[in-house]
Amino acid sequence: MILPIYTYGQPVLRKVAEDIPTDYPDLQQLIADMFETLTESEGIGLAAPQIGKAIRLVVIDLDVLADDMPEYKDFKRPFINPHIVEYDDSETESQEEGCLSLPAIHEKVTRPTRIRVQWLDVDLQPHDEWVEGFLARVMQHEFDHLDGKMFIDRISPLRKQLIKNKLKALLQGRFRCGYKTKLLPKKN
């Protein structure tokens, strides 16, 4: 089932997400719905807060990039209760980022190129790995959502001031995108 994506201004996007208990109801269906929503919206990553659930769940599908980045062929994974446990700050990189919850806004964000991540897979098996490159960037972006952060929190105050009108338009529902969204209720 395709779910609406919550846009900038929704309170759930600013909440710190809770760990998912092992007996979470219909977790496999939720993961399937998130992947379907991600495909429909033509994104590469989706965090549960973006669909209105304050739980630590992220899905990432980098297979769509396989023509340019063959190392991501068939890379389609859920990350349950993920946490970044270490940042290797010895090398950072600035790259433009966008977000399904911030349609039509793209800004350069500087992030470490290598991180250590712990998570559970779809079978609830634990993993602890160092991740680098583009996947590290995507994970940092998506895992930020689980901590109530968005990429615009990582740009300079000047850049944030320059996109102020775009953010205001999002809050007012004045934007276009090719996927279902959940807006803030209109104030009377």
Predicted regions and their residues:
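Active-site rim/adjacent substrate-binding subdomains
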Residues: 1-140, 145-188
